[in-house]
Amino acid sequence: MEAAFTTGFAEGRDIGAAVAVVVDRQLVVDLWGGHRDRRKTQPWERDTLCCLFSASKGITALCVLQAVAEGKLMLDEPLAEVWPGFGVNGKEAVTLRQVLDHQAGLIGFHEPVSAELLYDWSAVCSALERESPWWEPGTLHGYHARTFGFLLGEALRLATGSTPAGWLADRLAIPHALDLHFGLAGADLDRCAQMVPARVQAGSDATPESSRDLIEAMRDPKTPTGAAFQNPSMGPGYMNSERFRRAEMPAMNGHGTARDLATLYARMPELLPDEVLREATTTQSSGADQVLKSFTRFGLGFMLYDDRAPIGVRPGSFGHAGAGGSMAFYDPDARVGFCFVMNQMQQGVVTGGASAI
């Protein structure tokens, strides 16, 4: 694994990165290297924090599933039972399960919105109350790239009094000594890696074939893909701004280390009852993804292994990938938790160093 990890630097694919493997609760691989800034002046250190992008979704799903296990949220009751203002405009019967498995049809906003919206929890939740589904909930599935975290997070807040940031801190990070966060503050801001965007060239030979349809579809904000990823447009370099790092966007801006996210996945069997974990890792939706324009397979908040969309290395693995190449998963048969994070982003949904390792 060390050879595969260092190859990313030798080939110029990575600027800075970290990878960790936990087996039976024992940390057996813990590698980091390179630099945490584009100019390569600051070394990537043991405690460097990296933006996890959509690998954050697995953390948010765990928070919500713990609330389900405690009877505070119900998978198959209308979300409007805990969020009364939500149950309008075709959303009356939308369930928590449909949000977790990306069948709710609430992938984005029909009308143009400003990036300011995503920094205001109350405002974005009010906007979601006014939205209508892009398809009949439960009939199709499509990746809820940004809305996933707000929809689940508001349900969690109304049912328990905690948003994902609070639940993560109080129930997971602090008790288990995990360096994982939604919303950074103080000295933690100074530990962040600078994310370097991938070069996106639609139709270019440099663009992975699996990503070309996705990149083309992103160009039109009136399509499900464009609405999910480009409405609002966040602007260049947003992921490195202090404002973004301080915000709570539970689908896209978790920060942490590879070591601690691998550890979290390795402890999944302790963190969820068997019956909840079993259901969460059973296929809930699969097939043509209306947003990602490719095959995807989801459990309850987790991506599930499929040879067409590999999360892990074999059937049974579950976890989540993040934009640019990060990935975290648990392999229950081998009892292995894995995580790879990096700051040089690549194109594609599951790509880059994680796939190579």
Q: Regions from the language model: what does each represent?
A:
Residues 5-6, 25, 51-77, 152-157, ...:
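Active-site SXXK
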Residues 39, 125-134, 234-245:
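The feature captures the short pre-catalytic strand/loop hairpin that immediately precedes
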Residues 1-53:
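Short, conserved catalytic-motif segment at the N-terminal edge
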Residues 46, 51-55, 69-111, 129-130, ...:
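Active-site helix/loop module of the DD-peptidase/beta-lactamase fold
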Residues 45, 131-138, 148-151, 241-250:
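Flexible glycine/proline-enriched surface loops and loop-helix/loop-strand junctions
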Residues 249, 270, 276, 281-288, ...:
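Short, gly/Ser/Thr-rich active-site loops of penicillin-recognizing serine hydrolases
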